[in-house]
Amino acid sequence: LTELAKVARQGLRVSLSPSAVAEMERSLAWVEQAASGSLRDEQGRPQAIYGINTGFGSLARLRIPQENLLVLQRNLIRSHAAGVGEPVPRDVARAMVLLRANALAKGASGCRPALVTRLLALLNSGCDPVVPSQGSCGSSGDLAPLAHLGLLLCHLPEDPDNETGEAWFGNERLFGREALSR
């Protein structure tokens, strides 16, 4: 907790260990294999992997065509970025980023190491996500706050500014695209 507080409140720099990168690459290989359709079920069809090539919740049995998988993931982030209210304090948002980076670095989520590297770069640069203080989805309670972080990290060049999340850079509150360009 002491180091978490130092990162969140004092800007202690953080980095990713080579062993964490190796673990993430191992699980990423499995996710990429699943997303490519090369994992097969008993009938020889691409294996359904919840949330990777299927819908979510009541749409879990709906198979998503491979050409729509990126759209599925982006729309999930957009749909869950539904928080409202004043932003949480910056140190709370920074702690959230570090805790999520730490969880992803364990290698059980199938994410790219570049995602964790980018999260740590946010922390090290002082570019802090604006995370609304109210609203969430699901029993975990962290989906909406993390979706606001996701908007900041996963927008495309053609996205309107108001769909790129928001971040603090210095004392300025900016759209995500502008904050990340600094």
Which positions does each model-derived feature cover?
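Conserved, well-structured ligand/cofactor-binding cores
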Residues: 1-182
